[in-house]
Amino acid sequence: MIRRALGVAAILLCAAMLVTPQEKKDDAAWEKVAAALGKKGDLSADGVYKVTFPRSDLKVAMHGVPVPAGMGLASWAAFTRMPDGKYMVMGDTVMLGAEVNPVSDALRAGGIEIVALHNHMLGEQPQVMFMHYQGEGDAEALARTIRRALDQLGRK
């Protein structure tokens, strides 16, 4: 009886360790996303691949107190595979007012929809805007579009 239970447990453990073809496809997709974005992200247990981009180039102050990039001044993009095999991306981009049009133009040119443009703070200097977006399609193509949008940040 114990031997049989151990045998079943061993089989279940081996089965749990197998990587499905879809997981391999996702791993390859995340590698392409990282290459297109120029930065690796983190894969969560629920299959969301997220890459963050702190805006350490911005010198923002709130009531004279410096706001570090890690305190709400980071752009991010999160990807997941949909049941139909396409990928979805959602994200948030931190920007100055002068960066809004170039970033939105780059996102829309790549078929990514802008779903919100607003601020997260009041009284900060300089004023910082946040653009939320979403898109569906090929993971690498979405990542290339986001890279083109991020490349608009920090230009003078």
Give a label for each model feature:
Residues 1-9:
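Bacterial N-terminal signal peptides that target proteins for export
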Residues 8-16:
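Bacterial N-terminal signal peptides
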Residues 22-128, 132-156:
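Long, contiguous binding/interaction regions
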